[in-house]
Regions:
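Charged, low-complexity intrinsically disordered regions
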Residues: 1-39, 43-160
Length: 160
């Protein structure tokens, strides 16, 4: 059973031409408990990234991830720590693998507990069950924007 989600403390605007919203999100999932977290939502024109979700290895459990995003899992031999600590789910394996450059893999290793959901030109950035204090909101937004820049192809940086 899932109760209706609650959105609070909404802040929105534009940064470097990218629309954003930051909000506290709470949802109750009977099997998994209550999740309260601060989420950054980014929307940038011109991007067309594949649909995928990434989170810590224990993030919501294998079955829910499979249900939401497909069964494919990804492992990167060059980054065994990343592969051990993160699950990526999505359908377009080759397109998703292309996104996970050395810089992207290093970013996730340096930001433990990070969860991201991407679809086309939208990105959600959060840590499960972590609410961010008001003084740390700008830092969270900057992290999300940094990751977005890493996902953008080098020849497409101007379309943000």
């Amino acid at each position: 059973m899932c109760r209706s989600p609650v959105f609070e403390n909404l802040k929105h605007g534009t940064s470097h031409g990218i629309r954003f919203a930051i909000f506290d999100y709470q949802i109750v999932l009977s099997k998994f408990g209550t999740f309260c977290q601060t989420v950054v939502w980014l929307h940038w024109r011109g991007a067309n990234l594949p649909d995928f979700a990434i989170g810590p290895g224990s993030w919501l459990g294998q079955n829910l991830l499979d249900l939401l995003t497909g069964r494919n899992d990804f492992h990167f031999e060059s980054h065994p720590t990343f592969s051990k600590n993160h699950q990526i789910r999505g359908g377009n394996v080759s397109a998703i693998r292309e996104l996970f450059t050395e810089d992207v893999l290093n970013f996730y290793e340096q930001h433990p507990g990070l969860s991201t959901e991407v679809s086309g030109n939208r990105l959600l950035y959060f840590r499960v069950k972590v609410r961010v204090e008001p003084d740390d909101i700008q830092s969270l937004l900057n992290e999300a924007l940094q990751l977005l820049r890493l996902f953008q192809p080098a020849n497409d940086e101007g379309s943000a």
